[in-house]
UniProtKB/Swiss-Prot annotation:
Name of protein: Acyl-lipid (7-3)-desaturase
Chain spans, region Disordered: 15-60
Annotated family: Belongs to the fatty acid desaturase type 1 family.
Gene Ontology cellular component list: membrane
Reactions performed catalytically: a (7Z,10Z,13Z,16Z,19Z)-docosapentaenoyl-containing glycerolipid + 2 Fe(II)-[cytochrome b5] + O2 + 2 H(+) = a (4Z,7Z,10Z,13Z,16Z,19Z)-docosahexaenoyl-containing glycerolipid + 2 Fe(III)-[cytochrome b5] + 2 H2O; a (7Z,10Z,13Z,16Z)-docosatetraenoyl-containing glycerolipid + 2 Fe(II)-[cytochrome b5] + O2 + 2 H(+) = a (4Z,7Z,10Z,13Z,16Z)-docosapentaenoyl-containing glycerolipid + 2 Fe(III)-[cytochrome b5] + 2 H2O
Motif (Histidine box-2): 264-269
Short sequence motif Histidine box-1: positions: 229-233
Gene name of the record: D4
């Protein structure tokens, strides 16, 4: 059932014909030029990319106070395109809310490790807010602030509700009461998974066993779910080096951890189930809803094609190709183009170390997963073993990731605010029940944390076994609200998240069983595959 997802708005900022206020000039007085496809070749001769000098003295008293720059007495204004050009670690800028920050000298000091390089050249408001549940590091950030963004536009609303701040406070308090650290707690599980992974690899390669190839697929999926996923979110350990090593688990499977980080951390987590229109110079798109398009239609704002009416039938065979496609094709396309959809991947893939990691891991996996089995057992048998291993891994991973967002219980959004967002009778009933218990003002529907609750669905919430078998993805709501918290802690904070959601009138959606969640996904695919119903304004042919 389709209903209008109303009451959305976007905060527009006046640009006054593109000129800064109070007579201030753009950086170096240069007219900003658009960045073409994220290329960096123009930087050497681009006068608009000379790094401004930071003012001396202590940081401002408050987060939004102005900095005195070059004696002008006002902050400099920068455009989004100017920020985009500073995307490499040797010259890296980022934005948070309306502030522009030159973090080049801070990258090596960042307590969270190298994850900050993912945000270079782009808006990091969501990353900074969601990865610092104990509070935004304003004092540190102000040391690197160089100006204000002249043209900030975003779908999301910030600071208009206490929902997310209160949720953070109460979730962290619950962890403290339970004596659980925010990160870590996965060492024993990781050891068991890696042991099974390497033993099963040896068995299927050395003894041409299809059974062990399937076991490797299961173990490999858990390297992805339980090790690299937490590692690349900075949640596997309190040690940043250990997190980085855990994040390379994706490379261990045969896919690229770098490409995955851009798609998952930068794309999916920031813009969950969101499709952008032309309002934004940097589109706010969730790449996951386009991951199988046009073969499959997952978002109501993507165009329908006749073969989509059968997508609920061929979805599961297609899901099984997830890791094979990443190992053999899609990762290479991203590395060569430096783009994942609308996401510029230059900050990690241009530097030499990024190239060495990508190509080195790909070569090693090609030799160990394809060449060696083919050499030992013949080409046909070697490729068959490789296929079985990755079909099992791909199916397991795809289902675990997809059923939490592509579901009849999830919202699907568009930055134009005119799309019809899908709500089922179950979701409406849950919303009405939550409204009856509401004790606090309902946040605006485009509050970022609210959209995460609306676009995610849990299954078997609170279940410890389900939590470990899914790498915490059965607690999808908790994961999206607190990506830097270890999935081992999700059963602990889930009751708090549910309680706060109900207090603010937000439906906390949870399927009782895994099978219910799978059925919710299939039902959504059926609805997205049905031919669109003509409206009154449509002309009859």
């Amino acid at each position: 059932m389709l209903v209008l997802f109303g009451n959305f708005y976007v905060k527009q900022y006046s640009q006054k014909n593109g000129k800064p206020e109070n007579g201030a000039t753009p950086e170096n007085g240069a007219k900003p030029q658009p960045c073409e496809n994220g290329t960096v070749e123009k930087r050497e001769n681009d006068t608009a990319n000379v790094r401004p000098t930071r003012p001396a003295g202590p940081p401002p008293a408050t987060y939004y106070d102005s900095l005195a720059v070059s004696g002008q007495g006002k902050e400099r204004l920068f455009t989004t395109d100017e920020v985009r050009r500073h995307i490499l670690p040797t010259d890296g800028w980022l934005t948070c809310h309306e502030g522009v920050y030159d973090v080049t000298d801070f990258l090596a000091k960042h307590p969270g490790g190298g994850v900050i390089t993912l945000g270079l050249g782009r808006d990091c408001t969501i990353l900074i807010e969601s990865y610092h549940p104990a509070g935004r590091p304003d004092k540190v950030m102000e040391k690197y602030r160089i100006g204000t963004l002249q043209d900030p536009k975003t779908f999301y609303a910030w600071g208009e509700s206490d929902f997310y701040p209160e949720l953070k406070r109460r979730a962290l308090a619950r962890l403290k009461e339970a004596g659980q650290a925010r990160r870590g707690g996965l060492g024993v599980k990781a050891l068991l998974v890696l042991t099974l992974f390497f033993v099963s690899w040896y068995m299927w390669v050395a003894h041409k066993s299809f059974l062990w190839a399937a076991v490797w697929g299961f173990a490999g999926s858990h390297v992805g779910l339980s090790i690299q996923h937490d590692g690349n979110h900075g949640a596997f350990s309190r040690n940043t080096l250990v997190n980085r090593l855990a994040g390379w688990g994706m490379d261990l499977i045969g896919a690229s951890s770098t490409v995955w980080e851009y798609q998952h951390v930068i794309g999916h987590h920031q813009y969950t189930n969101l499709v952008s229109d032309t309002l934004f110079s940097l589109p706010e798109n969730d790449p996951d809803v386009f991951s199988s398009y046009p073969l499959m239609r997952m978002h109501p704002d993507t165009a329908w094609q006749p073969h989509h009416r059968f997508q609920h039938l061929f979805a599961f065979p297609l899901f099984a190709l997830m890791t094979i496609s990443k190992v053999l094709t899609s990762d290479f396309a991203v590395c060569l183009s430096m783009k994942k959809g609308s996401i510029d991947c230059s900050s990690r893939l241009v530097p030499l170390e990024g190239q060495l990691l990508f190509w080195g891991a790909k070569l090693a996996n090609f030799l160990l997963q394809i060449v060696l089995p083919c050499y030992l057992h013949g080409t046909a048998m070697g490729l068959a073993l490789f296929s079985v291993a990755h079909l099992v891994s791909g199916e397991y991973l795809a289902i675990c990731f997809i059923i939490n967002h592509i579901s009849e219980s999830c919202e699907f959004m568009n930055t134009s605010f005119q799309t019809a967002a899908r709500r089922t009778e179950m979701l409406q009933a849950a919303h009405q029940a939550a409204e009856a218990k509401k004790v606090k003002p309902t946040p605006p529907p485009n509050d970022w944390a609210v959209t995460q609750v609306q676009c995610c669905v849990n299954w078997r919430s609170g279940g410890v076994l389900a939590n470990h078998l899914s790498g915490g993805l059965n607690h999808q709501i908790e994961h999206h609200l607190f990506p830097s918290i270890s999935h081992a802690n999700y059963p602990t904070i889930a009751p708090v998240v549910k309680e706060v959601c109900e207090e603010y009138g937000l439906p906390y959606k949870n399927y009782v069983t895994f099978w219910d969640a799978v059925c919710g996904m299939v039902q959504h695919l059926r609805l997205m595959g049905a031919p669109p119903v003509p409206t009154n304004g449509d002309k009859k042919s």
